[in-house]
C-alpha cells in the first residue's frame, strides 16, 4: 500500500480549482460538424477567462490535450494561447493520455504548483470526431516522399507506376490499438464475457445514465458549467449536450443488435459512448493566489494516481488499478467518499470495473493487496449520469468530470469525490477532489 501524502505546494498550500467550464458535447457530424478541436479549445479557454474576470497575466501556464491530433496544429495548447486573450508570453504545451488526457493536464498544472514554478494555470482538453486527419496508405506516403525528391519526369513516372488503385484510397484514423489490433469495443466485449456482464445489466446502466443526465439538465444543475457555444459561421448556437435521451427505455435498447460481436455479443451502439466533439477546461491556483484575486474556490485536489496495465485482456480496467492508489495517497477508504464518478466508455467496462472494486480475488491476484477496496454504493455513483449520456470527446472528459463532481459536492454541502477513467493503451486515472 502507498502511504498517505499531503498534496501541498512548497509553501504548504493546497491546490485549488477556482473555475471550470465546458462546451456542450455534440455527437459526431452534428452541431460541431466542421469545427476543429483547436477552435473548440479556444472557445472554452476564452470563456473560462471571461467567466473568472481575471487578467490573463495571472494565467502562468496552459496545459491542454488532444487525442485525435491534426498535423497542421500539433501543439493545440500554444495555438489556444495565440487565439485567445491570453498573453503571447503564456507558457503552453500539449499532452496526450488517451481518454485520461485532461486528468493529465490538470495533474501537470498541479505538479508545477507543487514545485513552486507557478501559482496559477489552466488545464483542459478538446477533441473533434467530425474533423479528422484523413491520411494516405503507407505505399502512397512513401511515393509522395520519393516524388518530392525525384528530379526528372522519368523518375516520377517510375514512382507512380508502383502504385495500385488501393494505394490511392484515403485512410481514416485507426480505431484499433496499435500494439494489439483490438478496438475498444472488442475489448469491452471481452470484458463483458470474461466478467459475466449481461446485456440487460448494460442496458439498465445505459438508461440510468441518460435519465440522470436528463434530470440534471432539467434541474438546472449543469447550466453554470456548460457555456453556450457559437461555432463558425455563427448562424446557430448550442447550449446543451445533444446526445442525452431522457426517454431512453430498456425495451427500446433491447431491440438493438450488437456491434462488435454480431452473433454472441452484448455491446451495442447505445450502451457505448458515441463519437463526440467538445472541449472542457479548469482554472487552478494556489490557495493564496485565489484569495489575492478574490476568486471563490470550487474545491481542492486531494490526491491522484495513474496506472498502466496489460492490453491483451481487460485493457479498460484502469479505474480498478488507479483508484486504490489514489485512495491510499489521500489516506481514505472507498466508504469515505461522498461521490464516485467513473467514466462510462462502455456499460460493460463500467460494470466490470465496479465488480473488480469489490473483488478480493482481483485485489490479491492483480494488485497485490490483501482485500478489495469495497462495494460501490450506487447512491453515490454517477449521480448525474455519465459519458454514455453526455458523450466522450476523448481529451475533454477528465476536466468535465472534475468540474461536474466539484459542483455537485458543493450543491450537497461539501464532501469528497472520486473521478476515475480508463484509457486506451491499458491506462487508468483516478483523482480525489474535495470541497468545504
Swiss-Prot record:
UniProt cross-references to InterPro entries, sorted A to Z: 3-ketoacyl-CoA_Thiolase, Ac-CoA_C-AcTrfase_FadI, Thiolase, Thiolase-like, Thiolase_AS, Thiolase_C, Thiolase_CS, Thiolase_N
Pathway of action: Lipid metabolism; fatty acid beta-oxidation
Catalytic activity annotation: an acyl-CoA + acetyl-CoA = a 3-oxoacyl-CoA + CoA
EC number: 2.3.1.16
Any one of the GO CC terms: cytosol
Quaternary data: Heterotetramer of two alpha chains (FadJ) and two beta chains (FadI).
Protein name: 3-ketoacyl-CoA thiolase
Gene: fadI
Amino acid at each position: 500500500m502507498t502511504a498517505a501524502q499531503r498534496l501541498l505546494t512548497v509553501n504548504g498550500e493546497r491546490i485549488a480549482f477556482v473555475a471550470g467550464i465546458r462546451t456542450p458535447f455534440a455527437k459526431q457530424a452534428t452541431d460541431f460538424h466542421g469545427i476543429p478541436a483547436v477552435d473548440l479549445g479556444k472557445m472554452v479557454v476564452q470563456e473560462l477567462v471571461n467567466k473568472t474576470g481575471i487578467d490573463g497575466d495571472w494565467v502562468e501556464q496552459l496545459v491542454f490535450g488532444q487525442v485525435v491530433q491534426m498535423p497542421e496544429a500539433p501543439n493545440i495548447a500554444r495555438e489556444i494561447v495565440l487565439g485567445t486573450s491570453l498573453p503571447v508570453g503564456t507558457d503552453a504545451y500539449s499532452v496526450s493520455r488517451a481518454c485520461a488526457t485532461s486528468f493529465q493536464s490538470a495533474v501537470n498544472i498541479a505538479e508545477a504548483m507543487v514545485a513552486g514554478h507557478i501559482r496559477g494555470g489552466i488545464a483542459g482538453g478538446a477533441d473533434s470526431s467530425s474533423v479528422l486527419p484523413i491520411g494516405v496508405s503507407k505505399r502512397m506516403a512513401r511515393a509522395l516522399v520519393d516524388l518530392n525528391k525525384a528530379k526528372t519526369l522519368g523518375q516520377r513516372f517510375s514512382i507512380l507506376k508502383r502504385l495500385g488503385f488501393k494505394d490511392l484510397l484515403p485512410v481514416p484514423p485507426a480505431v484499433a490499438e496499435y500494439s494489439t489490433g483490438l478496438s475498444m469495443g472488442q475489448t469491452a466485449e471481452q470484458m463483458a464475457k470474461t466478467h459475466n456482464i449481461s446485456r440487460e445489466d448494460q442496458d439498465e446502466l445505459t438508461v440510468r445514465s441518460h435519465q440522470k443526465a436528463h434530470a440534471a439538465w432539467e434541474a438546472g444543475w449543469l447550466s453554470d458549467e456548460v457555456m453556450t457555444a457559437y461555432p463558425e459561421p455563427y448562424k446557430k448556437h448550442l447550449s446543451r449536450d445533444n446526445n442525452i435521451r431522457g426517454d431512453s427505455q430498456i425495451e427500446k435498447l433491447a431491440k438493438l443488435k450488437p456491434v462488435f460481436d454480431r452473433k454472441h455479443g452484448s455491446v451495442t451502439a447505445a450502451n457505448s459512448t458515441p463519437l463526440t466533439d467538445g472541449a472542457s477546461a479548469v482554472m487552478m491556483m494556489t490557495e493564496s493566489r485565489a484569495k489575492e484575486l478574490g476568486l471563490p474556490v470550487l474545491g481542492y485536489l486531494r490526491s491522484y494516481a495513474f496506472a498502466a496495465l496489460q492490453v491483451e485482456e481487460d485493457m479498460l480496467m484502469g479505474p480498478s488499478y488507479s483508484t486504490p492508489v489514489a485512495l491510499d495517497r489521500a489516506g481514505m477508504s472507498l466508504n469515505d467518499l461522498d461521490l464516485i464518478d467513473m467514466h462510462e466508455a462502455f456499460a460493460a467496462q463500467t460494470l466490470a470495473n465496479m465488480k473488480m472494486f469489490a473483488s478480493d480475488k482481483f485485489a490479491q491476484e492483480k494488485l497485490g493487496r490483501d482485500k478489495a477496496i469495497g462495494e460501490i454504493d450506487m447512491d453515490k455513483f454517477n449521480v448525474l449520469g455519465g459519458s454514455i449520456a453526455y458523450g466522450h470527446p476523448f481529451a475533454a472528459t477528465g476536466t468535465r468530470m472534475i468540474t461536474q463532481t466539484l459542483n455537485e459536492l458543493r450543491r450537497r454541502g461539501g464532501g469528497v469525490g472520486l473521478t476515475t477513467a480508463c484509457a486506451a493503451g491499458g491506462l487508468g486515472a483516478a483523482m480525489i477532489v474535495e470541497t468545504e
